[in-house]
Amino acid sequence: GEQPTATLRQERFFIGDHQPSDALWPIPLFANQPLDDILTEREKTFTANGDVRLNCGLNGHFVTHYDPATRDRLIEKAAELPTLDKICLLQDMTLLARSGRESSAALLPLARVFQHETNERVFNKAGTNLVELRKFVDDSEAGRARLKQISAEFARDTFMELGWDEQDGESDDDRERRTAALGLMLYGEDSAALTEVKRRFNETNPDDLPAEIRPLIINANIRYFEMPEMIDKLFTIYQNTPSADLQVDIALSLTSTKNPATAERILAAIQDANIIRPQDASRWFIYLIRTRENRQIAWNWLKENWSWVKDTFGGDKSYDNFIRYAASALLTRDELNDFTKFTKPLRAEPALTRTIDLGIREIAGRVALIERDKAAVIDALKN
């Protein structure tokens, strides 16, 4: 029969708005079979021996976009690849999805291939792909339920293997994998994990919890078992602990509340220097606005309290943080329109002009990505 061929074509890679580019580069291919070492032309066809894989060993600075059939075969066998090639595939797929060259739905089968991965970087990257999908189910309850279920399933074997507690002589890889797996189990509302997380929180002082999983333990207790006295206790510890790490863990946890009254209390504390120091205020704000249930509350607060932000941070290089952080979290078309409208009069301030323009671009890109891929992602989650 005829010798199979593979055609390689190069073009400049962009995410978001851009001017077209016809630049050509000499590209070292690092292929899995003898092709040219370097691709210098726009397009070239080679005889191929089976599927071509490029950038083996993650040596090149380029993104590889395979045709759908090759991509699917590659995903199927991805668990057998060398570690760096797994990382390459995961990184490229994320970038291709963000740029609109691949559907974000393709992140799902690729992530699930690495369920039994022992390398921490690969396991983490695959888990991060599942996290990337959360923005697509922001307003779909059925989609969220499926993503939670899939996230817990993905992490369960790894977590059962490693257990809750660090073993003597355990590798850094195992420590990192435990944290990633537990995070996915708790997002997935695994009932055994939630029962244990509650027990540990009730029986141990927050500062005595193991540092690696402490933020996850406190966070899950606020998210799923919140009681008013818990909030009081954590605010008190926050104000009195000498540990900056514990303060960050408490801020991350309190802001994950599902209770609007607690969110309002946090926003009041942001304006009270006796509770939250001004230099930490924007950190609390970003954690809060990134929590699905609190995004609108935090955004409304920013609009209503802008004069306080200006009075407090106007002369400081952190002044634009609140705008930048809001832009990193907003994700619906209504939120984009509202952000644009609110920031329009602020653009006249030189300290804010660039941040506002970048923010509008960032939200618009996210909205376009969600509108483009949402149906396909929800469909992939169903199957």
Residue ranges and their predicted role:
Residues 1-7, 16-21, 33-383:
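Long, ordered, helix-rich scaffold segments
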Residues 26-32:
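Extended low-complexity, serine/threonine- and proline-enriched intrinsically disordered segments
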